[in-house]
Amino acid sequence: MGVFRTRFTETFGVEHPIMQGGMQWVGRAEMAAAVANAGGLATLSALTQPSPEALAAEIARCRELTDRPFGVNLTLLPTQKPVPYAEYRAAIIETGIRVVETAGNDPGEHIAEFRRHGVKVIHKCTAVRHALKAERLGVDAVSIDGFECAGHPGEDDIPGLVLLPAAANRLRVPIIASGGFADGRGLVAALALGRSEERRVGK
């Protein structure tokens, strides 16, 4: 049992209130298994894999490296070549993944389908209004990404120290503080903001 028991650790069955978010080209089985074995919530990045079949194979490979919980990130982006999101979603469900992190465009249809199959959903948000919508859609938690986050920080340029308490004041679901956290001091800062989770990004 970890030092901190939180709604996040209890909801997602992990030892520590730390999540490794989806990272394109990096979120592979080796990294996810290392995070899971250390007691955090790990995620494989679905679109790092060139096809839904390759994702299913990567999930199987990760299970060879850990017997602890891990999830899959499914980022919904506009692309010139359509992505077969329904097929990726089906691969996630059919392989028995129990946690999904969605990000990007409107995740409504995906959230509904995941929840219909008993999959817990975390949605990554860069604004309080997006987080409130995700909560209305039925997510189990939201990741609040401040401007410090890597990847897709949104368009508002609001840092986490401002965005996180604003979100905490309005949301009922667990919040993962994301962006710029890389050590124990960051975790304590997340706790001081009134929430008990953080996404660890960085070295």
Regions found by a protein language model. Give the residues of each.
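Active-site entrance/lid segments in N-terminal catalytic domains of soluble metabolic enzymes
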Residues: M1-P174
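Conserved small/polar residues in nucleotide/adenosyl-binding loops
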Residues: E198-K203
